[in-house]
């Protein structure tokens, strides 16, 4: 489902003639096949708009935080910015904190930041910064392991236990596919911690844009987390 939006991002890099229309950004190239691919990708994305939000697709039944964030990150704001804004807010709790699966929900911060970069909507950014800040504070309390200097929880996108081996996978629960039904609460994953690193950087950029100064705390935490990632995963 996110392969389509990755295609959209790649098309932006192709030699093209972008222009705005009433329904968003359109692209034209000198290659008919690329134009056809663009049209197919846009139709596929639009097909998955349900109740004015971009759904995760197939039979998932609605939106998911990581899907919304990654779709925004991959460029869907170029042609459905209003839908993506509604989708981003739809996975929050009253626009105060990000909801849904806790371990990688911080990816919403990156999605919200990219939404701003593509729309330049400062009012959105002000609210998104508050929501992002509150969510990071929450996760620093419940998901941070100071002994490693890393955040806990499963890896990004792996919400099914088939992605993990024993002993994380509990062989006594073969019928339970949900990742949180197994021994995943205290593991530390590279992808998830990289998302936290990006979130700290995005928070710093949001603060800089809104306040015209660097947020020393977020910038420092990003660097510290990067060092801890390198030490724990690569040394």
Regions found by a protein language model. Name each.
Residues 38-41, 132, 218-233:
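Short amphipathic alpha-helical coiled-coil/interface segments
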Residues 137-148, 228-235:
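Secretory-pathway/luminal and periplasmic proteins that interact with or process carbohydrate-rich
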Residues 1-9:
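Sec-dependent signal peptide recognition
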Residues 19-129, 133:
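Substrate-binding groove/exosite segments of carbohydrate-active enzymes
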